[in-house]
């Protein structure tokens, strides 16, 4: 008996379009399904990346929702450092974790962008993600390209109910339709099982 795929992970090199793909899929399905979650948006000033913002998926696609700085090169004096960025742990708590906890109760599709080194610095983030993955919800998540180097991430990606897609410059134009189709089929299956 095959396991129903309801968790879709997208990985790929930085800048390849993971967040864009997730936003496009969420936007295409937003009026048909209850969608909640968050994205991590790169912020540039004068062509140079200065940090990342966390925002609700609804905010990311032009509707209302919370946002805050996840990390910045100079804005924060305290907090853990990853590369040149200081990470704002309170944004992970106030936006990512809070949204995921709400989404488990209310959403059909839960968007998690990204499961990566910055987000994993918060001790509650991984247990919250595991709670989401162990729910019956459909999940569309991006995972850091180096997930294989972290046993915690590798365990998430290798679940029998998960499908991993690696986004590249060569396949990214076709991958949107493939991911959208798979997510929509999982959502239809979820809806049928709840009827």
Q: Where is each model-derived feature located?
A:
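N-terminal phosphate/diphosphate-binding loop that engages ATP/GTP or pyrophosphate donors
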Residues: 27-81
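Hydrophobic positions on the alpha1 helix immediately C-terminal to the Walker A/P-loop
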Residues: 21, 25
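Conserved lysine of the Walker
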Residues: 18
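P-loop (Walker A) phosphate-binding loop of NTP-binding proteins
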Residues: 13
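Phosphate-binding/switch loop-helix module in NTP-utilizing enzymes
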Residues: 77-131
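Walker A (P-loop) ATP-phosphate-binding motif of ABC ATPase nucleotide-binding domains
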Residues: 7
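Hydrophobic anchor at the beta1->P-loop junction of P-loop NTPases
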Residues: 10
